[in-house]
């Protein structure tokens, strides 16, 4: 098995791709001579190309294909491109497929790869009939486990047991330099904790956002009582929401530089003493940089979405959570969390007693 070609299937989303990386690092450490190829969609393509344990990254252009197939003019060209994609995939002659995604499209890719060993999860742990495409099925425990643990357990299909895993996201030097310049400009003091706050989410995950006024009051208190430097981070669509919070604050805060990649964002978090935010991809990036995280959970599962490293969970049980109800208008689970709850959690994880 040492010289095998292995295909990894975890196509999206960014947070789930990130949570698969520790498993691949462990696999490479235990089987150092294997060649690892990963099929992934944007925006995770650049992130994976920067990670040394991955030998090749193949971009899966799902959105472009979905657009092309809509018109008669573009349909045949798109179908031809799909056929070529599959032919090129089969030419790689993969020995093993690890399907971490567990949905129909990853199952189809696994089958069309032509690999003789296709490792996936058993029926109850997959969706859309994915289990039909694997010939080695890994059974997961009935109790809830984190996504990190779920991914580690798939390696049992290769006879690997994961214990005490360690992981740090690799940041290329070209992504370290611009962030270093930003932090050097503010001469961070060893006596002032730098706290990164990421209040936003993607447009599809607004139901996970804590209240902006609560973030503003919390940030003020962190400055006033902990003498913290507050650094707000944001995604492409989140700047307006961050500015609303900053304008409502009475104390000064900083806006992190716009990051061009997930690894640049990781470098920002590496230089901070703490991350505060919701259950998002950036939270998992911070945890994989070794930065302690304080996570505000509303409608999502705090066990399944547990961070990798040192963390503290802030959550209120309101009877209906976790539910992942994207259309919920009440958001009782988030409104029940007060600034005092997050402030206490912050002091606890930082080891501060005042």
Task: Please state what every model-predicted region is.
Residues 1-354:
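Catalytic machinery of carbohydrate-active enzymes
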């Amino acid at each position: 098995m040492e010289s095998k070609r292995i295909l990894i299937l975890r196509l999206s989303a960014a947070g789930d791709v990130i949570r698969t990386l520790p498993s691949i690092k462990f696999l490479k450490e235990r089987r150092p001579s294997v060649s690892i190829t990963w099929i992934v969609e944007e925006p995770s393509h650049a992130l994976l190309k920067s990670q040394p344990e991955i030998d090749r990254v193949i971009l899966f252009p799902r959105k472009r294909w979905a657009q092309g197939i809509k018109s008669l003019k573009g349909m045949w060209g798109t179908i031809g491109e799909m056929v070529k994609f599959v032919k090129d995939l089969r030419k790689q002659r993969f020995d093993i497929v690890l399907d971490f995604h567990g949905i129909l499209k990853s199952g189809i890719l696994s089958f069309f790869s032509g690999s003789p060993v296709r490792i996936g999860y058993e029926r109850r742990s997959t969706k859309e009939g994915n289990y039909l495409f694997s010939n080695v099925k890994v059974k997961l425990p009935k109790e809830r486990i984190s996504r990190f643990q779920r991914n580690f357990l798939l390696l049992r299909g290769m006879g690997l047991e994961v214990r005490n895993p360690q992981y740090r996201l690799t940041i290329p030097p070209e992504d370290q330099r611009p962030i270093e310049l930003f932090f050097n400009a503010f001469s961070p003091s060893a006596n002032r904790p730098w706290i990164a706050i990421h209040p936003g989410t993607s447009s599809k995950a607004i139901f996970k956002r804590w209240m902006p006024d609560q973030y503003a009051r919390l940030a003020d208190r962190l400055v006033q009582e902990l003498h913290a430097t507050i650094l707000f981070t944001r995604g492409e669509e989140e700047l307006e929401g961050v500015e609303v919070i900053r304008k409502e604050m009475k104390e000064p805060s900083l806006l992190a530089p716009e990051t061009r990649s997930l690894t640049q964002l990781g470098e920002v978090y590496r230089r901070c003493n703490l991350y505060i935010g919701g259950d998002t991809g950036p939270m998992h990036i911070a945890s994989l940089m070794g930065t302690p995280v304080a996570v505000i959970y509303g409608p999502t599962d705090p066990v399944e979405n547990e961070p990798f490293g040192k963390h503290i969970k802030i959550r209120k049980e309101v009877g209906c959570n976790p539910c992942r109800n994207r259309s919920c208008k009440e958001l009782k689970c988030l409104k029940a969390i007060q600034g005092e709850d997050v402030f206490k959690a912050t002091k606890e994880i930082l080891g501060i007693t005042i």
